[in-house]
Amino acid sequence: VSYYKDAIVLAKKHEVPIVLDPVGCHAGAYRLSVVLDLIKTDAISLLRGNQSEIKAIYDALNINHKVDSSLSGKGVDGEQVEDSAIITYRLARQINCPVIATGEEDYVSDGIRVFTVPYGHSIMTAVTGTGCLLGAVLAAFFSSYCPFMYNMSIGEFLAYTLAYYGLAGES
């Protein structure tokens, strides 16, 4: 963890987008505090987590930095969160970067609009590595957004990326 600030400096210097996956931040105060420190650098290009993780971050930024242990899930797993679309939108506006909250329905917000992507599936949480793979796919697509930026918003572009991933998972 001590090297993340150096990594951020190098990423900014070389214009490399930073995709943050706050794995298990809803499960404990230490992980959440590290994620909040990363967000406060204003260097995050995209925040992607399950709905419980995104809610924990939103709550911590808005309710005295406390973790809602009722959403602890088991390990890095999360649960479907009520009002996740609203939380995703508000968090994207607050931290000024796109936010993705995954679950049975995925939500994407660029702080202007929220997109619902219905291709999430509960079985994906039972397969180890699907969240990590999604992070890699999002990073690859995110880094290729420039040619599309005049045709669609980043939120719409990321919603298409999630749809692509979800449909590929159905095969």
What are these regions (language model features)?
Residues Y3, A7-G49:
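Glycine/small-residue-rich loop that forms an oxyanion/phosphate-binding "nest" at active or ligand-binding sites
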Residues G24-G28, Y107, M124:
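Short, small-residue-enriched loops and turns at beta-alpha junctions
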Residues L32-V114:
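Conserved phosphate/ATP/ADP-binding segment of small-molecule kinases
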Residues G111-M124:
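Glycine/charged-rich beta-loop-alpha catalytic/anionic-binding loops adjacent to active sites
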